[in-house]
Amino acid sequence: MAGDDLVFAVNGEKFEVLSVNPSTTLLEFLRSNTCFKSVKLSCGEGGCGACIVILSKYDPVLDQVEEYSINSCLTLLCSLNGCSITTSDGLGNTEKGFHPIHKRFAGFHASQCGFCTPGMCISLYSALSKAHNSQSSPDYLTALAAEKSIAGNLCRCTGYRPIADACKSFASDVDIEDLGFNSFWRKGESREEMLKKLPPYNPEKDLITFPDFLKEKIKCQHNVLDQTRYHWSTPGSVAELQEILATTNPGKDRGLIKLVVGNTGTGYYKEEKQYGRYIDISHIPEMSMIKKDDREIEIGAVVTISKVIDALMEENTSAYVFKKIGVHMEKVANHFIRNSGSIGGNLVMAQSKSFPSDITTLLLAADASVHMINAGRHEKLRMGEYLVSPPILDTKTVLLKVHIPRWIASSTTGLLFETYRAALRPIGSALPYINAAFLAVVSHDASSSGIIVDKCRLAFGSYGGYHSIRAREVEDFLTGKILSHSVLYEAVRLLKGIIVPSIDTSYSEYKKSLAVGFLFDFLYPLIESGSWDSEGKHIDGHIDPTICLPLLSSAQQVFESKEYHPVGEAIIKFGAEMQASGEAVYVDDIPSLPHCLHGAFIYSTKPLAWIKSVGFSGNVTPIGVLAVITFKDIPEVGQNIGYITMFGTGLLFADEVTISAGQIIALVVADTQKHADMAAHLAVVEYDSRNIGTPVLSVEDAVKRSSLFEVPPEYQPEPVGDISKGMAEADRKIRSVELRLGSQYFFYMETQTALALPDEDNCLVVYSSTQAPEFTQTVIATCLGIPEHNVRVITRRVGGGFGGKAIKSMPVATACALAAKKMQRPVRIYVNRKTDMIMAGGRHPLKITYSVGFRSDGKLTALDLNLFIDAGSDVDVSLVMPQNIMNSLRKYDWGALSFDIKVCKTNLPSRTSLRAPGEVQGSYIAESIIENVASSLKMDVDVVRRINLHTYESLRKFYKQAAGEPDEYTLPLLWDKLEVSADFRRRAESVKEFNRCNIWRKRGISRVPIIHLVIHRPTPGKVSILNDGSVAVEVAGIEVGQGLWTKVQQMVAYGLGMIKCEGSDDLLERIRLLQTDTLSMSQSSYTAGSTTSENCCEAVRLCCGILVERLRPTMNQILENARSVTWDMLIQQANAQSVDLSARTFYKPESSSAEYLNYGVGASEVEVDLVTGRTEIIRSDIIYDCGKSLNPAVDLGQIEGAFVQGIGFFMYEEYTTNENGLVNEEGTWDYKIPTIDTIPKQFNVQILNSGHHKNRVLSSKASGEPPLLVAASVHCATRSAIREARKQYLSWNCIDDDHRERCDLGFELPVPATMPVVKQLCGLESIEKYLEWKTYP
């Protein structure tokens, strides 16, 4: 083995790579060159955690191994020479046995679609390893550390609660009885019994072994790669680095050299150019050391942020400035980015590219300095000087060290240091709206007993300026002054003139307000108390939200039924352990055949324009590109079709005209996915907007220009009652109120993906991550002009769908098939996250105007609505929206209900179905109206809601046959039960008391009901008993994480168990679900609408009934000559008698049970921080009528996951477009779904086991979509808290109580209620008003 070869290990296996492109990432190598596919590509920018691995490094001097988690999507392969990598399937797998982490994730039902689970497991393992190796408390993993271990990991399915429980089960300080519902023990068992049933974990036996062959290599060699073959240099000293840099021709080679440490910067600044040489500077001792003395801490520039934090936190209590900096730095990015990213890299990005850095702000406040070298000349600059110096754009200037001085107070003065940041996620993985760090030396004024500011440093950053700054005018003003309300008021006014975001900065006024709030929080407690505390005091005794306590214990109440054993039992999800280990196969995990090609989409950036040409800059074809496929490449016998629905079809490629930004124009086909993506990025599309008209970019424009889709009569909802009579009966009316609801992105962890294989006789096999294989088959066949039997579409499992893998997956699979047919080679497409977000469309935005009539007691009499639905450029499934919206809005007895609904055709991205499409909007509209009515009447909104809940008679009036029988209407029961179980009345009073006692924090509590109509669809199923008695099952539904396979497996075991022979009660482990294959399972329709699991279960139950009847004669014959019969004996004899052991049915629901209503109630308590607008969900309680659950564990997961996805819609997720209709949000940096630190702190879910559904599938009900609607309780509680803040704000304007109540009317809380939105409604100038009120009462 040559010493200059790239050698490393993966899961103990040796890999020797003789030549590789230095830009190759570890993720690319693992997925393309190894069998280890547990590392998943989801975001490609270090923001989701799906690609996490453990990196182990050996130090031959200390004979120690260091291990930590890293992003494989950003880590360059060449930087891993001599390292060992461990993936989730390296921790454990099917062959060697699963790791305790895998087993506990499965047992706590913490994996649904499974795409994120391997990364979650690695993050937890990393935390366990760190705890084991800790010097202070080995083997002691706290519950807080367990939860924080997954703070950088995203999950769209579970809602995080079961994941948190799985993680906390390893914590030493957790009360095991507080852990959530699981399959290890049942309620009532002793603590000792519970502990025995947990899969045991022994850290001593669980250590990753660093391979001996790597140890020997490291001991014997310098471990430097051949620079010629790898274009990779690894200097061992600063002098050697200077020598390498000096050989570079500044003119010819400028920009071709890249300095590398962790390569994490490419997650934010995407790499768009080819580098000729990479220099790994992470091995230079002078840049890798941390030195401490009495004056300062000196930190090498390549030291990772994690190691900087450790060094700062190790300091004694007297150096609390260091500790404060360390605590704040734990909020930077996520733990795996901090493990790789260096402090120097962060500072250089901030200085040269205006990266919104927290670290520069911290160091600026602490008066840090940097040590740099340029062409042999050393230079030391203070942080302020460094930031304003000319940007470091060349590779000749290198940052060597950072110096942070020690700050120690004298005996007569106090030293104060505090840091701040406002971000959508409290503990990281989100850039701040603004950050700040303040240092002050203070002393007592003997004459006034006040506090004098002797010295201060006030630093602000990330607000939209070029870099972090000091507010010197404010510092000068405060220095020497005795703090008072008037002094602070003037300081705040000065500060607002300093914090001036650039013109194109979003939320500029909000950011100014935050700066004011931070300064107020720093200084105001000193005024109030007249004393200081080195640990820092906060207004209202406020605890820094980033110093998080672990989630409170949550409660899940479920009922496991034995009536239909094993149906109704909470068995572990089928394949959950394989999902955790990463062995579960998704489309992109299928190995590529030789000569496989890859595709990437070129999309439009214009909403309406002629397409003149598609090419590349300078007419130079990028490396690796073999073809660019457009509509012109569709066979003459085919059609330019990309999708099909019951309402029509849509284009695969834009032909001569693009009708929306984000529309597919072409497909680049290249030899690798990286080359395809890079080529698509470099593509140049020439447009011509002449003689084509003005694009329609709003619903108002659409209505004005009559650009509307016509809704078929059968999809038009019917009005209820006489609206004129209803309005006449009203004592009060609210007229012409306008609401708007934005869009939402699916954020499935697995983006759109497909693999197409040309087959013999003009056939194709297409693997597609789709919810609609049969529709996909039809579209491909139509596009290519071949019979459908020539197209075989296969789907095994989908890494999250939520509706986005239904219609929107079809053009991806179709383009892939077209390319495969044209090139006569396998082609695969894995759409990158940015392109996926731009093309996805997402949830339908709405504009609503309404007028409502009601009596003085709160009873509604009439509602008149005008709805404008933005469908985008294509019809898709938008014509179901009117019916869906009205179905959920009818949950209240409106008296009379009329509406005018327009489905608008715009030149915006085509919208599609997203979990609870239309229903979540309709339910929210109802709540907004109820809130407005209650506010108008000065009534408790909870009372108004209860008054207007349906009686059974009004329910029948609004829902007709779907209402079912009277005993099926459980909503009033749920409403009353939740009041007791959630302690709603007492907590409502506690909220009032809290609001009376706190100025800068307000709480709200709200309870909302939901009604959600679902429809059963005809569904096929097939059950085959094989020779050995094992069972193969095929169903039309797709496993997208909803537990469909598990429920079907249970149903087959129940159905075949009716034969009642020995072994028939234990069939569950002998049943296997097969992947969906359109040539095997026809008429499969699509997976959507929450009832697919029920439909498939009923289809296989009917199959089992047929098989049982076929087997009974054989069983009776055996029993004539034997006392008993075993399952194996029965099947063996049936085979001998040529009994048909395969049954296929087509379940067609009866009209009496084809549609039914789902009921639920949710209550949430929310706290709002008036300084920042941050919301915290204190507690959420849900009671949901699931009928007789087919699997309570699965349904519980669906309820929690849907609720948290709803929180995202109502509170966090902004999915907007620019002036051309192109999506603004492009990835994890700017689109924020909920994370572990944003879910309810206490999360209680109860499944009502109602037995009133005998005509349903074993009395079960749907759980996938309805609970999402309950998340409106969070939004309504936030509205309540804001209302209290607004009342207080008005009091500071010296408005009397009566007038204040009148002024409180008319505010609407937009969706999503993000921090800037909440803060604006609470008052952007609330602090100024408060100080003015205190100064000039």
Curated annotation (Swiss-Prot):
Entry binding sites for Mo-molybdopterin: 771, 802, 915
Pfam families, alphabetized: Ald_Xan_dh_C, CO_deh_flav_C, FAD_binding_5, Fer2, Fer2_2, MoCoBD_1, MoCoBD_2
GO cellular component labels: cytosol
Catalytic activity: indole-3-acetaldehyde + O2 + H2O = (indol-3-yl)acetate + H2O2 + H(+); an aldehyde + O2 + H2O = a carboxylate + H2O2 + H(+); benzaldehyde + O2 + H2O = benzoate + H2O2 + H(+); hexanal + O2 + H2O = hexanoate + H2O2 + H(+)
UniProt domain FAD-binding PCMH-type: residue ranges: 225-409
Binding locations of [2Fe-2S] cluster 1: 43, 48, 51, 73
Superkingdom of the organism of origin: Eukaryota
Alphabetical UniProt keywords: 2Fe-2S, Abscisic acid biosynthesis, Auxin biosynthesis, Cytoplasm, FAD, Flavoprotein, Iron, Iron-sulfur, Metal-binding, Molybdenum, NAD, Oxidoreductase
Record localization: Cytoplasm
InterPro entries tied to this protein: 2Fe-2S-bd, 2Fe-2S-bd_dom_sf, 2Fe-2S_ferredoxin-like_sf, 2Fe-2S_ferredoxin-type, 2Fe2S_fd_BS, Ald_Oxase/Xan_DH_a/b, Ald_Oxase/Xan_DH_a/b_sf, Ald_Oxase/xanthine_DH-like
Binding site for [2Fe-2S] cluster 2: 113, 116, 155, 157
Cofactor(s) required for function per UniProt: [2Fe-2S] cluster; FAD; Mo-molybdopterin
Free-text tissue specificity from the UniProt record: Transcripts expressed at high levels in developing siliques and at low levels in dry seeds.
Induction / repression: Induced by dehydration, in rosette leaves but not in roots. Induced by hydrogen peroxide H(2)O(2) and aldehyde treatment.
GO-annotated molecular function: 2 iron, 2 sulfur cluster binding; aldehyde oxidase activity; aryl-aldehyde oxidase activity; benzaldehyde dehydrogenase (NAD+) activity; FAD binding; indole-3-acetaldehyde oxidase activity; iron ion binding
Summary of pH dependence: Optimum pH is 7.
UniProt GO BP: abscisic acid biosynthetic process; auxin biosynthetic process; cellular response to aldehyde; glucosinolate metabolic process; response to hydrogen peroxide; response to water deprivation
E.C. numbers: 1.2.3.1, 1.2.3.7
Function: Aldehyde oxidase with a broad substrate specificity. Involved in the accumulation of benzoic acid (BA) in siliques. Delays and protects siliques from senescence by catalyzing aldehyde detoxification in siliques. Catalyzes the oxidation of an array of aromatic and aliphatic aldehydes, including vanillin and the reactive carbonyl species (RCS) acrolein, 4-hydroxyl-2-nonenal (HNE), and malondialdehyde (MDA).
Name listed for the protein in its UniProt record: Aldehyde oxidase 4
